A protein has these predicted regions:
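Sec/Tat signal peptide C-region and signal peptidase I cleavage site
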Residues: 19-23
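Bacterial N-terminal signal peptides that target proteins for export
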Residues: 1-8
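Catalytic glycan-binding domains that act on GlcNAc-containing polysaccharides
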Residues: 24-147
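Bacterial N-terminal signal peptides
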Residues: 9-17
Length: 147
């Protein structure tokens, strides 16, 4: 019985030390959304989506970032859950600054690790995007980011 206890304690200690090291690495590599600079990504997305035209329209998507009514509703649901009184309107999609605010709000909730790839693909294909279906869009945005 004593040997089993020693083995279990050893396994537990090993697990805790690996877990602790992993947490330290994550805290070093990950920057919170409020500190992460999404501006280059947003500007590249704007160029791909609308070439910077705030009056751009394509189906239900409008504005520089081609925001849909569903995304506006999701942003308002997030704000409601956060007990914020702020709400977005459908006309806010035509505002460059409010479009960027909605993008940042979505990243803060659905992309807490600030993955640029996830942000780009989710903007094109939704939160449950298909890598295959978003590949061309991802490459377009990344090519602009590399310039």
């Amino acid at each position: 019985m004593n040997r089993i206890t020693k083995v279990l304690v050893s396994i537990l200690m090993l697990t805790l030390s690996v877990s602790s090291a992993s947490a330290e690495t994550n805290s070093i590599n990950n920057v919170s959304s409020s500190e992460f600079d999404w501006n280059p990504v947003m500007e590249a997305i704007i160029q791909v989506e609308s070439e910077g035209n705030p009056k751009a329209k394509s189906g239900n998507s409008v504005g520089v970032m081609q925001i849909t009514p569903i995304l506006v509703a999701e942003c308002n649901n997030i704000l409601k859950k956060k007990k914020s009184k702020k709400r977005y309107t459908l006309s806010d999609r035509y505002s460059i600054s409010k479009s960027k605010e909605m993008f940042l709000l979505m990243q803060s909730v659905y992309n807490p690790l600030n993955s640029i790839e996830q942000a780009i693909r989710a903007w094109n294909g939704g939160n449950h995007f298909s890598v295959k279906k978003t590949q061309r869009y991802f490459e377009k945005v990344m090519n602009l980011l590399k310039k």
